[in-house]
C-alpha cells in the first residue's frame, strides 16, 4: 500500500504568503513532518494529525521518516519554509528516493508544492524586483566547498548579474559573506 508525499513550501512565515494548494494538501494530510520551527508556522492547520518535529541538521532523518510513512499508506506533508525546491528539502527527498530505487510509476505519489521563496519576498519588501537576469548563490559550505562558492560568485559578478545571497552566515561561518564581497 502506498500513500502520498507532499513536499510543501509554506512561504516566508505568514499564512498570507502561503499558496492555496499548500494549505489544501496540509489539511488533507494524515501526517505532518518538518523542522520544528516550520511545523509551528502551520500549527493552526494540523490539529488532530500525527506530527513529527525535528531539530535543524536532521534533514536526512526527516526525509527517511516522511518517505517511510508515505510507503505505509499515509498522506504526508513535509513542510519547508519558502520554496522547498530552493535550498530546501525537495532535492534531498528525490535523492533518497532515487537511492532506494523509487519509480514514479510505482504507486508512491510524490508532489512538490512550491511556495513563495525568500528571494521573492525580500525583493518585494525592499522594492527591488528581480528583472532581466539574476543569480542565486548560497554562502553555506556544508555541501559545497568554499572555493566553488567563490568561483560561482565571481562568475555571477563577471556576468553583471544581480546576486541574491542565501545563508550569508551562521554560528560557524561568520566571514564568508565579507570574503565573497571582495570578489564582486
Map each language-model feature to its residues:
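Active-site rim beta-loop-alpha module in soluble metabolic enzymes
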Residues: 159-174
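Charged helix-capping and loop-helix junction motifs
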Residues: 150-151, 176-180
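Short gly/pro/ser/thr-enriched loop/turn and capping motifs at secondary-structure boundaries
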Residues: 39-41, 59-60, 86, 117-120, ...
Amino acid at each position: 500500500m502506498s500513500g502520498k508525499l507532499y513536499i510543501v513550501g509554506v512561504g516566508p512565515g505568514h499564512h498570507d504568503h502561503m499558496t492555496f494548494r499548500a494549505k489544501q494538501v496540509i489539511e488533507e494530510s494524515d501526517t505532518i513532518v518538518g523542522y520544528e520551527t516550520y511545523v509551528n508556522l502551520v500549527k493552526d492547520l494540523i490539529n488532530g494529525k500525527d506530527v513529527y518535529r525535528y531539530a535543524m541538521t536532521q534533514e536526512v532523518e526527516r526525509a527517511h521518516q516522511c518517505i517511510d510513512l508515505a510507503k505505509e499508506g499515509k498522506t504526508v506533508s513535509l513542510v519547508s519554509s519558502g520554496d522547498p525546491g530552493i535550498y530546501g528539502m525537495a532535492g534531498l527527498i528525490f535523492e533518497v528516493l532515487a537511492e532506494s530505487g523509487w519509480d514514479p510509476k510505482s504507486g508512491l505519489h510524490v508532489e512538490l508544492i512550491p511556495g513563495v521563496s525568500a528571494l521573492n519576498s525580500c525583493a518585494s519588501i525592499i522594492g527591488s524586483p528581480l528583472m532581466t537576469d539574476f543569480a542565486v548563490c548560497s554562502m553555506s559550505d556544508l555541501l559545497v566547498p568554499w572555493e566553488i562558492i567563490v568561483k560561482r560568485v565571481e562568475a555571477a559578478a563577471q556576468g553583471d548579474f544581480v546576486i541574491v545571497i542565501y545563508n550569508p552566515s551562521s554560528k560557524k561561518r561568520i566571514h564568508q559573506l565579507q570574503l565573497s564581497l571582495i570578489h564582486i
